[in-house]
């Protein structure tokens, strides 16, 4: 075989391998194109509907830095998009999956958090539970969303991200499963470990796993296992009985109502979604309630 033929064969095997790791060629889900504008920022996104049972969930995946742009295509090629979509299908979880794309000149922080919130608001009325997951820049963005919008999400899974600038008290209001790799040269494992300790100190529910030898890229690709996703999606809300929500087996009382932007409400609205703050002998906790 000629050198050119050998090279072509090698490239074929390489593309086959990475097609499995990063592609979505055989995914059953159809992602439709969408676009949203907020505060002068235009953000493309993809949306797919997963059929299943029960009340629908809203699932948001935040991509890493290499998928920024406006083609509305690169985020779908990330391995996590496929892993999460397949999981939802296999578990028959009725859900709306959102995969937004960050503009090339921005990151998942600052004003982009408000843009993401406006996208979530667009679909909030249809869903009972909200989940957010992300890797690398998307992992950091996931941490940031938990910090800026405490109690909005039912559970979250940031991987290979940086939570060091986040408010641990706010983040602790959402159950979190995070993963890091010992060979990650971009994110700091110790910083994440310290932050998880802070979450525990605030009575937060947080799982932290460190994979030996995993690089930054490996962590972003391989973290979304069935076992971990089972943990994330095992957290559910029950809007019909939210006033009797318990934590640690104790009854809790309502101490306040808030809009999604943190403004205190004198009473719950007669329509729409809002946040309820509870208090009890296990501390305070925020969760979402919907009125139709």
What residues fall within each predicted segment?
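A domain-start/cap signature at the N-terminus of enzymes
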Residues: 6, 19-58, 95, 135, ...
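Gly/Ser-rich "nucleophile elbow"/oxyanion-hole loop immediately N-terminal to the catalytic nucleophile
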Residues: 51, 104-137, 147-150
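Active-site machinery of serine-nucleophile hydrolases
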Residues: 58, 62-114
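Acidic beta-to-alpha connecting loop that harbors the catalytic carboxylate
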Residues: 65, 102-103, 137, 182-185, ...
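Primarily recognizes the serine-hydrolase "nucleophile elbow" in alpha/beta-hydrolase
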Residues: 127-172
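C-terminal catalytic histidine-bearing segment of alpha/beta-hydrolase fold enzymes
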Residues: 177-179, 185-239
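Residue-level detector of functionally pivotal "anchor" positions at catalytic/ligand-binding pockets or at interdomain
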Residues: 237-263
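C-terminal tail/sorting-segment detector
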Residues: 240, 245, 273-292
């Amino acid at each position: 075989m000629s050198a050119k033929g050998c090279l072509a064969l090698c490239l074929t095997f390489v593309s086959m391998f990475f097609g499995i790791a990063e592609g979505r060629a055989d995914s059953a889900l159809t992602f439709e194109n969408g676009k949203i504008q907020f505060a002068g920022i235009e953000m493309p996104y993809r949306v797919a509907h997963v059929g299943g049972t029960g009340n629908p969930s809203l699932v948001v995946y935040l991509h890493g830095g290499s998928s920024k742009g406006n083609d509305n295509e690169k985020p779908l090629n990330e391995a996590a998009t496929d892993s999460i979509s397949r999981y939802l299908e296999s578990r028959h979880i009725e859900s709306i999956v959102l995969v937004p794309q960050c503009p090339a000149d921005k990151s998942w922080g600052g004003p982009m958090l408000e843009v993401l919130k406006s996208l979530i608001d667009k679909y909030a009325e249809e869903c009972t539970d909200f989940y957010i997951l992300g890797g690398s820049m998307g992992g950091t963005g996931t941490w940031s969303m938990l910090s800026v919008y405490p109690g909005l999400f039912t559970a979250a899974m940031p991987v290979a991200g940086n939570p060091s600038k986040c408010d641990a008290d706010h983040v602790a209001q959402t159950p979190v499963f995070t993963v890091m790799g010992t060979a990650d040269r971009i994110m700091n494992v110790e910083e994440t470990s310290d932050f998880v300790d802070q979450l525990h100190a605030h009575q937060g529910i947080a799982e932290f796993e460190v994979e030996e030898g995993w690089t930054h890229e490996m962590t972003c690709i391989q973290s979304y296992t069935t076992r971990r996703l089972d943990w994330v999606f095992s957290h559910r809300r029950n809007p019909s009985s939210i006033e009797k929500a318990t934590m640690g087996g104790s009854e809790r009382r309502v101490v306040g109502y808030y809009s999604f932007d943190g403004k205190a409400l004198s009473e719950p609205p007669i329509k729409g979604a809002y946040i309820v703050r509870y208090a009890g002998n296990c501390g305070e906790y925020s969760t979402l309630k919907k009125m139709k």
